[in-house]
């Protein structure tokens, strides 16, 4: 029906058209297979049209169909699809070239096919020439294309059955793979659920780990603050200790000075007692010393002024202590000067007054020194209390710090252990998750490979099935064409038979006239008619299958002793009927046409006898056939007639088939050649 071109079309936009034939028969639907490249997104607005080759615009299409959008599209793999053009929309047969074009929704041509034609099959297309080499000799066989197509149809049917079995096996494998995929999906779902649970646990552990880390950071900061506070307290304690030491040193100095002053006071008291004793002794001299006493009162007034000045300078106690020492030295000097005044009353009274004044001053200074000492002692006591409080607080803080350190160490050790345990668990879970992910990935890869292989096998099966269907359609169309031609041949055959009957009637009239003129010739022709193949008409009518003559061969063996009884008419010239092999029975084949073929052969035999007996009568009877048929018929008989007329060697008038023992005239080589091949 059509000759397929398995080469793929060159693609301008990536779309490849597969199995595009060079010719298509009209009035039969056309199936178009194409492949979209990876990355192409098919749309329901895309369409495939049949265009003329010279068409320059997408609107110049003859017909089109919308493209089919696949249900499942795999990323990274080509998409195979097919569409069908109905027979009523196809172009009319002719020499015009067409091609498929894929147009996307933007109106851009994404691919085109090789050109093809729509035409009816020609009569010469129904014959196929086969060349075979057998035993070193080339044999050229010309057989009907229907036989070849029938063989191809049988092979396609067998291949289709094999493909169906393979499809069933693949469907079984697909079912098994689907069950395996479902099991793997269930396992994957369980693994994902377990992975989700592990992820939740991991998140919980991560949150707890984060909280513990934050607590650890807070404790670390608190520890740093406590350590800084402890360092500050230690520095404060060190400073206070230094201050306490300084105060103690200063207190020791004050105590030493107080002791010295106390000793001096005792000395002064002893001197005062001595002075009082001297005073009692010098009362007599008191009057003499009144004037000196007035002067001493003035000095006392001056001393009071100085006392006021010293009270103003009470805050500068430390400086006045030195002045007191100087004053005490002066007092001592003055006391030392009092001894010579014992003799002199005035000097003694003056010294007594001054001593009293100085004693009062010293008493006040001692009182202020005692107050300062008490204040210093109170401050020292307060400092000691502060130091004791600070030490107690420091001890408490140190104890609390030690407790916090021990507790923090314990918590840190526990946290480290828990973190290590969680890390181990996380590592184990990560390894398990990686293993599961790897297994799932491998299963996905295998399932993807299986799906790809199944899709490829399915596509190839669909393509082969569509090819088989297309070839089957072609074969059916060819068979319909053959049936039509067979009907035409039958009609022509019927016309030829009618024409042969008319010729037979004319030949019978001519033969009657000729036989009435020459009885001897009539008897001879009757004898020859009994022995020639035309006498086998009855047997051929009884068995029409024997009239199917296969290709020619030569029967070399003959039996000369099996000839019938000879008579006086044997020496007369023989009328040889050359009977070529019929062509119509080989082409038609059915057994019910054999009877009509045998009748046609009888008519041809009579016609050939008439032609060989006289060319003029044949020309009168067959004006339509002309001289060509006469030359062909007379050519078969010229050889035997020439040999008989030249008086060659005597040969038996009959030949016998070694298989069926059927007898033939010696000179009918063509019929013998044809008959022998019926047994081959």
UniProtKB/Swiss-Prot annotation:
Residues 1-30 are annotated as: p300 KIX-binding. Disulfide bonds: none annotated. Zn(2+) binds at residues 657, 660, 675, 679. It is found in: Cytoplasm; Nucleus. Residues 511-606 are annotated as: Disordered. Signal peptide: none annotated. Residues 145-205, 232-339, 417-514 form a coiled coil. GO terms for cellular component: cytoplasm; nucleus. Gene3D superfamilies: 2.60.40.2840. Part of a calphoglin complex consisting of CALCOCO1, PPA1 and PGM. Interacts with the bHLH-PAS domains of GRIP1, AHR and ARNT. Interacts with CTNNB1 via both its N- and C-terminal regions. Interacts with EP300. Interacts with CCAR1 (via N-terminus) and GATA1. This is Calcium-binding and coiled-coil domain-containing protein 1. It comes from Bos taurus. The lineage of its organism: Eukaryota, Metazoa, Chordata, Craniata, Vertebrata.
């Amino acid at each position: 029906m059509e000759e397929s071109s398995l080469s793929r079309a060159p693609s301008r936009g990536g779309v490849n058209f597969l199995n595009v034939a060079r010719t298509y028969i009209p009035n039969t639907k056309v199936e178009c297979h194409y492949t979209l490249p990876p990355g192409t997104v098919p749309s329901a607005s895309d369409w495939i049209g049949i265009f003329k080759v010279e068409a320059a615009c997408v609107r110049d299409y003859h017909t089109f169909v919308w493209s089919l959008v696949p249900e499942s599209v795999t990323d990274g793999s080509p998409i195979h699809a097919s569409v069908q053009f109905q027979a009523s929309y196809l172009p009319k047969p002719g020499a015009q070239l067409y091609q498929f074009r894929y147009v996307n929704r933007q109106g851009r041509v994404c691919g085109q096919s090789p050109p093809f034609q729509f035409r009816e099959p020609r009569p010469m297309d129904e014959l196929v020439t086969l060349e075979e080499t057998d035993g070193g000799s080339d044999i050229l066989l010309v057989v009907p294309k229907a036989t070849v197509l029938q063989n191809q149809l049988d092979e396609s049917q067998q291949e289709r059955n094999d493909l169906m079995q393979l499809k069933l096996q693949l469907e079984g494998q697909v079912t098994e793979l689907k069950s395996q995929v479902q099991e793997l999906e269930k396992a994957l779902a369980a693994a994902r659920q377990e992975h989700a649970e592990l992820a939740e646990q991991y998140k919980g552990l991560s949150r707890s780990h984060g909280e513990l880390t934050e607590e650890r950071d807070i404790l670390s900061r608190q520890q740093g603050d406590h350590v800084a506070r402890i360092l500050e307290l230690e520095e404060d304690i060190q400073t206070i200790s230094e201050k306490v030491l300084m105060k103690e040193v200063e207190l020791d100095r004050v105590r030493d000075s107080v002791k010295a002053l106390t000793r001096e006071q005792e000395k002064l008291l002893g001197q005062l007692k001595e002075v009082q004793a001297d005073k009692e002794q010098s009362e007599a001299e008191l009057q003499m010393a009144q004037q000196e006493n007035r002067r001493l009162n003035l000095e006392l007034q001056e001393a009071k002024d100085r006392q006021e000045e010293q009270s103003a300078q009470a805050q500068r106690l430390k400086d006045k202590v030195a002045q007191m020492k100087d004053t005490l030295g002066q007092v001592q000097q003055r006391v030392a000067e009092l001894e010579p005044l014992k003799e002199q009353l005035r000097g003694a009274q003056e010294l007594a007054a001054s001593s009293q004044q100085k004693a009062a001053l010293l008493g006040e200074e001692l009182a202020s020194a005692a107050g300062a000492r008490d204040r210093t002692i109170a401050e020292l006591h307060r400092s000691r209390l502060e130091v004791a409080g600070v030490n107690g607080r420091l001890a408490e803080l140190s104890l609390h710090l030690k407790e916090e350190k021990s507790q923090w160490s314990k918590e840190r050790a526990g946290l480290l252990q828990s973190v290590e345990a969680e890390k181990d668990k996380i590592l184990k879970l990560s390894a398990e998750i990686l293993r599961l992910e790897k297994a799932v990935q491998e299963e996905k890869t295998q399932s993807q490979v299986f799906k790809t292989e199944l899709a490829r096998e399915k596509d190839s099966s669909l393509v082969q099935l569509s090819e088989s269907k297309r070839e089957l359609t072609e074969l059916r169309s060819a068979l319909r064409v053959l049936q039509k031609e067979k009907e035409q041949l039958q009609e022509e055959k019927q016309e030829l038979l009618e024409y042969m009957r008319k010729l037979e009637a004319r030949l019978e009239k001519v033969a009657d006239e000729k036989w009435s003129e020459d009885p001897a010739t009539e008897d001879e022709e009757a004898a020859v008619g009994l022995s020639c193949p035309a006498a086998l008409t009855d047997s051929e009518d009884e068995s029409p299958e024997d009239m199917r003559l296969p290709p020619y061969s030569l029967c070399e063996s003959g039996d000369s002793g099996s000839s019938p009884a000879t008579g006086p008419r044997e020496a007369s010239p023989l009328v040889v009927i050359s009977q070529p092999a019929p062509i119509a029975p080989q082409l038609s084949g059915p057994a019910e046409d054999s009877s009509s073929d045998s009748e046609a052969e009888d008519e041809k035999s009579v016609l050939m006898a008439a032609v060989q007996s006289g060319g003029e009568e044949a020309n009168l009877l067959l004006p339509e056939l002309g001289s060509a048929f006469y030359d062909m018929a007379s050519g078969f008989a010229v050889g035997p007639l020439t040999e008989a007329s030249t008086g060659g060697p005597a040969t038996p008038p009959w030949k016998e088939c070694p298989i069926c023992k059927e007898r033939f005239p010696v000179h009918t080589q063509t019929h013998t050649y044809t008959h022998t091949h019926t047994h081959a």
